Every structure is written in structure tokens, then in C-alpha cells.
Amino acid sequence: MFEKRGYMLDISRDKVPTMSTLRRIVDLLKVCNYNQFQLYTEHTFSYSKHETVWRNASPITAAEIRELDAYCRMNDIELVPNQNSFGHMERWLVHPEYNNLAAMPNGGAVTPWGTIKKDPTTLDPSNPGSLELLSGLYDELLPNFSSRLFNIGCDETFEIKDPEAYLGFLLKVCDLVRERGFRPMFWGDIILKHPELVERLPKDLIALDWGYEGNHPFADETAKFKAAGLEFYVCPGTSSWNSLSGRVENMRENMAAAEAAGRRNGAKGFLVTDWGDFGHWQPLAASLPGMILGGWFADHGPKANRMDLEEALDSVMGVPLGGTLLRLGTLYLRGGALRANASELFRILSNDRGYSRHPNLTESVLVEISAVAEGCRHAAAAFTSPTLYGPGAVWAEEIVYMANLVDAACHRRDERRLKALREEHRRVWLLRNRPGGIDDSLSKFPRF
């Protein structure tokens, strides 16, 4: 068993849950024996002096954080504050008021995957205004939490090529955190690219070693943090994002690798991450297998592989759709058209130009996938009556929507299906989430 067993939900890729949904998530985390919860935040906290950034996002407020913190404490869960503080700041830096704080004000950073970031994403570590901004944010955010930990992010700083500049700014941000009585946690990806810097990190930092594929080298990476005497967590993911209906087998392998390496090298915690890249199209149901299995791995180690996930899903949802959900979550394997951090079906649906379909994903394979999705849709549709099935009907609605996402990917040029899907996306979104962000999410759907 890991001492710290956490779940982190992305609330900054357009989708901010309602308070009712957040409470239900806490209920689920308690059932799964988690003891930490984080809300990944870029721009979706209602900072009083920065309305420009969050105006259309339906942000979470200070009062709501205090309410959620109290609810978490009632359930023996620590609500850990989370505010990215170096990279992933594009929602700030695109605005004229903040653009001067960007390392590359005109954008154009090249990612490790060869893509180009149109907008600026990273704070300029040489600009004193960057620390001044963060100082003000921390003063407003942190007093709402009873936890003394704080996840400052600092991952994927694409514009910063000098490792010394990265380390220097990271250490200054950590000073701001300590001054407010908190202990900093940070994503370890950049430091791991420069292992000579690991030894220079203060020993009170908590490194978060993230990776989301089944073959991620957790063993090698955690060994570096262990050798440096740093406390660290292993951070696998639900594999729900960029997938339409999940990547269940990858999720299993990813969590098993994280658990094994974390156990071997003495990880303090196991943090399940649940991202919403490219519009957070997937509903909560797509993440549910990973939420449950992640709790099992964190609490029971390798025994998790022998537990009955379908039965657990049925129990949590209150409707017998666990098998249906898992079938949808394995459709990405059909045809052997695999890619990292996404499903081929997602790529088909999300790219309306310049995309070349994987040669293994033939028309006959798409017909086969569509038929399975239709069967799953039909099975879930039988449980969508709130009168008969209560909260289980929402899970069923989400599974129907996931099946329709997959079917739309298989019929990518069917304008009628895509128009209906856009309407369904909005309706299903509002079952659990606030309205802010829907239009941004829909802007990533195919257009005609």
C-alpha cells in the first residue's frame, strides 16, 4: 500500500465540474480508498484581479474550494491545491495584459513531438513580473486549503531551452511556496531530461514522475529520484483522454508499471491523473475504470490485476453496464492501429484536415468497430431513465455518448451524424459540468 493515494482531475481543458459532481467524485474516491484529491488548474480559479482569464470558464470560486475542502476532510481525503506555475500558461499569456510575461510572446515553440505551439505557453523566468504574478495567485488561492502540500506543476516548459534557467525559476517558485507554509510538489519531466540537476534539488521537494504508456520507464526514472534522496510519487493515468472511449489495456499496463516501480524504489505516493486534452470530449464514465483500478493498485499492489473490474463498475454505476464500458474501452485495439497518448479513432474525429489515417484502420475494420459501438449504445440506452435508474442513468447516458463518438469517427464524413453529435456533446456535458468551456470544446469538433 502506498501511503499517499491520490486522484487528479483536469479542470482546465474546458470542463469544470459542478459542485454536486465534485462531491460525488469525493464519494467515489473514498470507496476506492484514495486519501488525496487534486484539481489540475491553469485558469479556472476565480482570481479576483484576473477576470479576463477566467471570464467564460465557469471557474471554481474560493468559497467552493473551502466547501469542497471541508467535504474532503469529512471523508478522510486531503484536497491538495494545484496551480500550474511555469508552462501551460497559454490561457493567461494569450491576453495582452499578460503577454509581456511570456518567454516567447509570439508563440512558435516546437514541442518534443515536432508540433508547433501557435500561442505562448511558458512564463519568462527572467522577467520579475512572472514571480510577482505567481505571488499574487498564491496569496489568494492557498488560504482556502487545509492541506500543506501544493502542486506547482512546472511541466512541459517548451520555450525554455536552458536547464539552468529552468532550475533557477523552479527554485524561486518553491521559495514562494515555502514562505506561505506549504511544501512544493512538481512534475519531474523537465528535471529528468537533465539528470545532473536532480542532485541539486532541495530535499523538501516532492517529485511527481508521470508517464501514460504501458511501457513508460518508471523504473529508471524513479531510481534517479531515489538516488537523490527525494520524496516522489508515481503518476500513471486513466488513459481516457484523446481516446473517445478509453484505452483500457494501456491503462492497466501503465498502472501496473507505475505500481511495480514505485513499490521497488520506495515511492511515497501513487497519483492517478485524469487529463482533458483537446477539449475534454470524454465523459466521466470513460475515466471510471482507471479511477477504480488506480485505487486498487495504490492500495493492493499487484493483487489489483486479479480483481473483478466489471463487477466493481456495475456496483459503482448502479446499472449493469461495466462490461459494456470495458468493451468500448478496448475498441482502440481493433486493427492494431495504435499510437501513443491517443487512439486512432480520436485522431480521425479530431482532425478535419491534414490527417492521414493509419493503414491498418481499413474500411472493413471501421465497419466492425461501428457495429460493436452500436451494440454498446443499444445496451446502455436501456438504462437512461432517471425515474427507473436514478444516478445510474447519467452513467448510461455517458456510455451512449461514448458509443456515438466512436460511431461518428467511423463515419467521419457524415455531416448529419456530426451535427447530432455536437448537440449531444452539449447535453451530456451539462449533466455533470458547468456551461463555461463548452464552446471552446466544441470548436475542436470537425467543421463543414
Predicted features, each with a name:
Residues 1-161, 165, 172, 176-178, ...:
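Feature activates predominantly on carbohydrate-active enzymes
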Residues 27, 67-70, 76, 128-143, ...:
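Substrate-binding groove of N-acetylhexosamine-processing glycoside hydrolases
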